């Protein structure tokens, strides 16, 4: 009886811990708690270049040669042949404007963010906007697509399995902790943040030129003022010493 009660108690504790863990990490990654299915990368190529469609955090859409966390997409079917594409890392919907330019948006619009998927004979897929009649394309040339014509470059996509480690989607970016000079003194006991004292220049009145030997008088025979130092110090007194100091003062 006691063993059965202990087993029930351990089971209840495990259930509570698992629920707490799921709640604690529910917002750390867009992949947790999502019903969108597996990750997919839309690959397109020409004879020279190949790219994966990626949606950046600012909504910009471009291509990358290799798979990244921003090229990881989740694709779901809305109705027969209609799909919605969202960036797994940015949570932005792939949308299209009236000129055929694609972008990522947080707000879903059925007219701009829903595409009709067709599979071509070569096995590649194209995504057509029913509203604007343009194909999703990473190329610069935009033209209205008509069935039976060749699609524009970088508009035929092949769905590829995700090869980016899932750890890259969960790891948070490191933050750099900095301090400023306005912090309280107890946060900077060694005065590292405070600026070092600067030496003030010698006043102009204190700088003197050495007399030339060609000049007459006692100054010429005693250019360094060794013999006249005693008399000069007596004349200056305490005030003159403060006013004309040869050494810099630190402020």
UniProtKB/Swiss-Prot annotation:
Q: Where is this region: Disordered?
A: 175-251
Q: Sorted alphabetically, which SUPFAM superfamilies does this protein's record hold?
A: Cytokine
Give the primary localization class.
Answer: secreted
* Phosphoserine PTM positions: 180
Q: Which residues form a coiled coil?
A: none
Localization per record: Secreted
Q: Which sites does the entry annotate for glycosylation? A: 171, 178
Question: A GO molecular function for this record?
Answer: growth factor activity
Q: Which Pfam families match?
A: FGF
In terms of SMART domains, this protein maps to:
FGF
Segments of skewed composition (Basic and acidic residues)? 179-189
**InterPro entries to which the protein is assigned, alphabetical:** Fibroblast_GF_fam, IL1/FGF
| Listed GO CC annotations | cytoplasm; extracellular space
Q: How is it modified after translation?
A: Following secretion this protein is inactivated by cleavage into a N-terminal fragment and a C-terminal fragment. The processing is effected by proprotein convertases. O-glycosylated at Thr-171 and Thr-178 by GALNT3 and glycosylation of Thr-178 requires previous glycosylation at Thr171. Glycosylation is necessary for secretion; it blocks processing by proprotein convertases when the O-glycan is alpha 2,6-sialylated. Competition between proprotein convertase cleavage and block of cleavage by O-glycosylation determines the level of secreted active FGF23.
**Disulfide bonding pattern of the chain:** 95-113
**Could you mention a single GO BP entry for this protein?**
regulation of bone mineralization
Question: What's in the keyword line of the UniProt record?
Answer: Differentiation, Disulfide bond, Glycoprotein, Growth factor, Phosphoprotein, Secreted, Signal
Signal peptide interval:
1-24
What tissues contain this protein? Expressed in the parathyroid.
What is the role of this chain?
A: Regulator of phosphate homeostasis. Inhibits renal tubular phosphate transport by reducing SLC34A1 levels. Regulator of vitamin-D metabolism. Negatively regulates osteoblasts differentiation and matrix mineralization. Acts directly on the parathyroid to decrease PTH secretion. Up-regulates EGR1 expression in the presence of KL.
Q: Which family does it belong to?
A: Belongs to the heparin-binding growth factors family.
- Quaternary structure, from the entry: Interacts with FGFR1, FGFR2, FGFR3 and FGFR4. Affinity between fibroblast growth factors (FGFs) and their receptors is increased by KL and heparan sulfate glycosaminoglycans that function as coreceptors.
Q: Which PANTHER family match?
A: FIBROBLAST GROWTH FACTOR
The protein's name in its UniProt record:
Fibroblast growth factor 23
Q: What lineage is this protein's organism placed in? A: Eukaryota, Metazoa, Chordata, Craniata, Vertebrata
């Amino acid at each position: 009886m006691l063993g059965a009660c202990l087993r029930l108690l351990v089971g209840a504790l495990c259930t509570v811990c698992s629920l707490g863990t799921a709640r604690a990490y529910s917002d750390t990654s867009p992949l947790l708690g999502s019903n969108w299915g597996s990750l997919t990368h839309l690959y397109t190529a020409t004879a020279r270049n190949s790219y994966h469609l990626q949606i950046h955090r600012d909504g910009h859409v471009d291509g990358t040669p290799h798979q990244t966390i921003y090229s990881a997409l989740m694709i779901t079917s809305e109705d027969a042949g209609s799909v919605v594409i969202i960036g797994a890392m940015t949570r932005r919907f792939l949308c299209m404007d009236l000129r055929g330019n694609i972008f990522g948006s947080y707000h879903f619009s059925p007219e701009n963010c829903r595409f009709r998927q067709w599979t071509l004979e070569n096995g590649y897929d194209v995504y057509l906007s029913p509203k604007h009649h343009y194909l999703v394309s990473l190329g610069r040339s935009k033209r209205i697509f008509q069935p039976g014509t060749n699609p524009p470059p970088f508009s035929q996509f092949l769905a590829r399995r995700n090869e980016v480690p899932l750890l890259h989607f969960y790891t948070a970016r490191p933050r750099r902790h900095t301090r400023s000079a306005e912090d309280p003194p107890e946060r900077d006991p060694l005065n590292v943040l405070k600026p070092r004292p600067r030496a003030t220049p010698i006043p102009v009145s204190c700088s003197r030129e050495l007399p030339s030997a060609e000049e007459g008088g006692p100054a010429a025979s005693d250019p360094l003022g060794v013999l006249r130092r005693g008399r000069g110090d007596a004349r200056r007194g305490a005030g003159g010493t403060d006013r004309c100091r040869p050494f810099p003062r630190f402020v």
